[in-house]
Regions:
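N-terminal intrinsically disordered/low-complexity leader segments
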Residues: 1-10, 196-200
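Short hydrophobic clusters on alpha-helical segments that form packing/core surfaces
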Residues: 15-23, 96, 163, 188
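Hydrophobic alpha-helical connector segments
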Residues: 76-102, 155
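Alpha-helical DNA-contacting segments of helix-turn-helix folds
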Residues: 51, 58-66, 110
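Helix-turn-helix
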Residues: 2-3, 11-14, 18, 22-57
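Hydrophobic/aromatic residues within well-ordered alpha-helical segments
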Residues: 62, 66, 70, 96, ...
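Hydrophobic/aromatic-rich alpha-helical bundle segments in the mid-to-C-terminal region
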Residues: 107-111, 121-130, 141-188, 195-200
């Protein structure tokens, strides 16, 4: 009895992934339900069976779970290294770099299309994002007590700017993913921790 639900959920996730790729490539307003349907090999009207709220529902469902997973992952890593802020910072950076390299389309949509959402889901996403940033701020302040909240927040956002550059690297960069991960990790850690030493 549960098999149809699993199939439906998988199909829904597949459609969401395709929609995000289209939103990232063409912009939210440059993509129609028919465009998404064509990419997913389903008629545009039939998409409303999966997403009754249309594109808005797709956009919200693509971004809210991602923001929630980032926050949950951030909390998990900071808790795992509660007694070692430098290890916590490395864990956070490694975690976010992995996300950035595996989800560049999601990042592009977050950066450029979030304001297309109605206020309720938009505010929910913003709240999750702010909480995620505060995980980084807490780690930075434990590592560098001389920093105030504002300074730590500025540094965290600067590091996000580095790590979230993956949408601009192009598809050819996928073959160089290990090297790009290393470069982004070292750049972020160097920006955040003056005492960071590159690993050999």
């Amino acid at each position: 009895m549960t098999t149809p639900k699993v199939i439906n959920r998988s199909r829904r996730e597949e459609i969401l992934e395709l929609a995000v790729e289209l939103f990232a490539a063409r912009g939210y307003h440059g993509v129609s339900m028919d465009d998404i349907g064509a990419r997913a090999h389903i008629t545009g009207p039939a998409l409303y069976h999966h997403f009754k709220g249309g594109k808005e529902e797709m956009l919200a469902e693509a971004l809210i779970p991602v923001s929630a997973r980032l926050l949950a992952g951030g909390r998990e890593h900071t808790a795992a290294h509660a007694d070692d802020p430098r290890a916590a910072l490395r864990a956070l950076v490694t975690f976010h770099v992995d996300f950035a390299l595996t989800s560049p389309a999601v990042i592009a949509v977050q950066l450029h299309e979030l304001d297309r959402l109605p206020s309720e889901p938009r505010h929910r996403i913003r709240k999750l994002q702010r909480s995620y940033v505060e995980e980084w701020v807490g780690v930075l302040r434990r590592l560098r007590p001389e920093l105030g909240d504002t300074d730590a927040r500025v540094l965290a956002h600067a590091a996000f700017g580095l790590m979230n550059s993956t949408p601009f690297l192009g598809r050819d960069s996928l073959a160089e993913r290990p090297r790009i991960a290393e470069l982004l990790t070292e750049a972020a850690l160097s920006a955040l921790d003056p005492e960071h030493r590159s690993t050999p």
